[in-house]
């Protein structure tokens, strides 16, 4: 196992798995470490060798949240996905939307606006990319935002979305095209 020293904490890497031995997160933007634990186990003799095993698993996060997860039913044999679980594709789209929303709301606040609600029905498109690999190539955010008090102009909303997109850590980390189709509250 190789080790990377981050401040005074050690993080181990064994193959593709990262093991956190303790956490020190900086607030200055220079470095932060985030973890998730993904758990799956085979349930008896369920046709594993033939690909007929459950894709249901769980994601656990450092704050204590445990989320049921599964492969998308669109990508695995029928009956092997748990449709109630969050699939990685949905989580990817939600993480982009959530990051954008959090920055948008904060920038609106800084501009003296009051956001009452923000609902985004984001959609992602999975298809072959330019290299012929299956990827989420496009995510369209479709936020509906309701403000109290002073109402922003459509230009101001566009500028807030641009600032939010430029600041979003997730958007800065992916090659997926991200579009925003702002909708009237």
Residue spans for each PLM region:
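Compositionally biased, low-complexity segments
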Residues: 18-22
């Amino acid at each position: 196992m190789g080790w990377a020293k981050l401040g005074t904490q050690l993080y181990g890497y064994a193959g593709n798995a990262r093991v956190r031995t303790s956490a020190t997160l900086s607030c200055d933007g220079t470095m932060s470490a985030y973890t998730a634990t993904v758990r799956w186990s085979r349930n008896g003799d369920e046709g594993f060798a033939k690909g007929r095993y459950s894709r249901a698993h769980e994601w656990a996060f450092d704050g204590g949240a445990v989320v049921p997860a599964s492969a998308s039913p669109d990508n695995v044999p029928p009956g092997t996905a748990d449709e109630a679980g969050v699939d990685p594709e949905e989580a990817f789209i939600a993480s982009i939307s959530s990051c954008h929303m959090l920055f948008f709301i904060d920038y609106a606040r800084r501009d003296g606006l009051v956001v009452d609600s923000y609902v985004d029905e984001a959609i992602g498109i999975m298809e072959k990319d330019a290299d012929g690999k299956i990827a989420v190539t496009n995510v369209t955010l479709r936020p509906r935002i309701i403000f109290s008090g002073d109402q922003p102009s459509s230009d101001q909303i566009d500028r807030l979305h641009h600032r939010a997109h430029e600041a979003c850590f997730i958007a800065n980390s992916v090659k997926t095209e991200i579009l925003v189709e702002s909708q009237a509250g």
